[in-house]
Amino acid sequence: MSEQSRCPVTGRTADSPATGSGLSNRDWWPNQLHLDMLHQHSSLVNPMGEGFRYKEEFGKLDLKEVKKDLYALMTDSQEWWPADYGHYGGLFIRMAWHSAGTYRTSDGRGGGGTGNQRFAPLNSWPDNANLDKARRLLWPIKQKYGKKISWADLMILAGNCALESMGFKTFGFGGGRVDIWEPEEDIYWGKEVEWLGNKRYSGERDLENPLAAVQMGLIYVNPEGPDGKPDPVAAGRDIRETFARMAMNDEETVALVAGGHTFGKCHGVGDPKLVGPEPEAADIEEQGLGWKSGYGIGKGDETMTSGLEGAWTPDPIHWDMGYLGMLFRYEWELTKSPAGAWQWKPKDVAEEDLAPAAHDPSKRVPTMMTTADLAMRMDPIYGPISQRYYEHPDQFADAFARAWFKLTHRDMGPHSRYLGAEVPAEELIWQDPVPALDHDLIDAEEIAELKKRLLASGLSIPELVSTAWASASTFRGSDKRGGANGARIRLAPQKDWEVNQPEQLQRVLHKLEEIRNTFNGEQSGNKQVSLADMIVLGGCAAVEEAAGKAGTGVTVPFTPGRTDALQEQTDTESFSVLEPLADGFRNYMKKKYSVSAEEMLVDRSQLLTLTAPEMTVLLGGLRVLGANFQQSPHGVFTTQPETLTNDYFVNLLDMGTEWKPLSKEQDTFEGRDRKTGEPRWTATRVDLIFGSNSRLRAIAEVYGSDDAQEKFVHDFVAAWDKVMNLDRFDLG
């Protein structure tokens, strides 16, 4: 081969594969534990730098000016992608809705909080067709305000401004969404390998957890009906399941569908085969835009998007009762769009109920409804709600405003995280409110005194540790729910969860309450300590005591300031999704699952925002502290229980132990002395993965070394402190 064909630096030829190409480890070993999800979104991929503080930058933003620019954009139709009816409102509502609408309650993942619609796979989902144009239309505004407003905030704000510019009064807007710079590794979107696949169902029509959408690449349901079959009643069942998994009840669902479909139109005037590839598959010269259509001019009245065609209302750019009016005033007959999609047309429609053509106001065209829309009338539950909204427009407007606000803010956590002048004063129950701090905080001397009382109370180290862990470890970094603040572990439903060992929990809480009441009664002035703080402080005191027993003196950080929520501030149904199906840190599995215990451990660790080293040191420490569910001996690799030693790692890595499964499911194991055959330990998959997985074993070796005891304790304390404070947004 000629030297001209070789790279002068690497010596590679023109036929050599690119660096980083070829099979990955996961290609070779598909069942390999997916630890990469614990190390996402690092400073290495973030161009903003480690010192960037979005909250500070957003505080410099003139929100009124941004909104003024967004209002102007709504009617500034661009030749490269002209606005339907001269107004981009419908497009931006869809963009904001589809940004927020990926949220699901089961794991809190998805939603509009990260700006992930910019990246694959979402930027190329079939349901997001042509939303790439919406984001490009926003670019001049993003460019103008730069780091002061994130893409995530701008997309939601654009949806609000679209509604307001068409005459609707929104409930408010809270900023504070921080952009990510790479696609998430932790979100499971489904097992399908083709767009619109639906292998997510089993049985009659049981949708796989944690999924909410009915098909791969859809945000909600198939608008043509289940699996494309135009059955409005069956569609209603799909809609109810899907919206419930996205935190919406029946009234909110009707309000969102009817309110959102008051605006804009669907696009399906030609052959869908003429539509080009999605953004991630498009040619480089398309510069990140996809779905280039070969039908006509490919835009305007010849746009292809969903395959459905037409507006829902006669006036698609103004807030009115047009959607519900059309839904109830007409009978509907099944038809197909020009693109071949099932939809419905009104029978004997009056002239005044025709809509203008989107790009030629001199023409009048029929409106349409999708099968999903007709479910709002024909479903036995949705129908009466729709009728009530139709008869009470003010009630409908309020319901839509509140449901839209919930849709676009559900994944942001508590009210205290919202930024900006348009944050509503009203706290809503789905924001998991906690009372405002109304007392003076305990100081270092009083903290030390309370620790003494806790350790002298008769409560054991395992009881104090496991109670604090149970309270704090409900936190989910995905939607910022859960955590120790509020002491909701004493309320329904958490007090009754099996994993929390209710009988033991009540005994521990009673003793903590007793110590708290005695202390508070001794105070003069306004100084108090909350039960939420007592729960965490008890765990901290126990960790300190256990470290001292191991000969490693340490002070576990503790910051008071938590308050105690009331039962009426706690939506029991909403909180039920926080119940752990498995908690590897306590060696707990509610039942057998198709997903392995070690995978569930990594998933839980990711929700707790833990890295692999933090996960490792926490689990090893909690084992020797005796925090296992029902005091199980599995994984307690120590002869000095309740002592914070690195024994877990020393004994796990001991080649003198040979492990054998105790069950055909290979979920529990026994370790015997390799020479004598004498039993030494028992363990679960969650324990043995730290010796089996090469990456986790490498970390375990750090903590199992002869010189590692002090590092182990300090790393455990740091990780413990992190978990105890995950929901302390007041600490910055």
Swiss-Prot record:
Substrates-to-products reaction catalysed: H2O2 + AH2 = A + 2 H2O; 2 H2O2 = O2 + 2 H2O
PTM remark: Formation of the three residue Trp-Tyr-Met cross-link is important for the catalase, but not the peroxidase activity of the enzyme.
Alphabetically ordered keywords of this record: Heme, Hydrogen peroxide, Iron, Metal-binding, Oxidoreductase, Peroxidase
Gene Ontology terms: biological process: cellular response to hydrogen peroxide; hydrogen peroxide catabolic process
Positions annotated to bind heme b: 261
Named cofactor requirement(s): heme b
Cross-link (Tryptophyl-tyrosyl-methioninium (Trp-Tyr) (with M-246)): 97-220
Key word Nucleus present: no
Active site: 98 (proton acceptor)
Marked site (Transition state stabilizer) residue numbers: 94
EC number: 1.11.1.21
Listed PANTHER family: CATALASE-PEROXIDASE (PTHR30555:SF0), HYDROPEROXIDASE I, BIFUNCTIONAL CATALASE-PEROXIDASE (PTHR30555)
Similarity annotation: Belongs to the peroxidase family. Peroxidase/catalase subfamily.
Protein name per Swiss-Prot or TrEMBL: Catalase-peroxidase
Organism annotation: Prosthecochloris aestuarii (strain DSM 271 / SK 413)
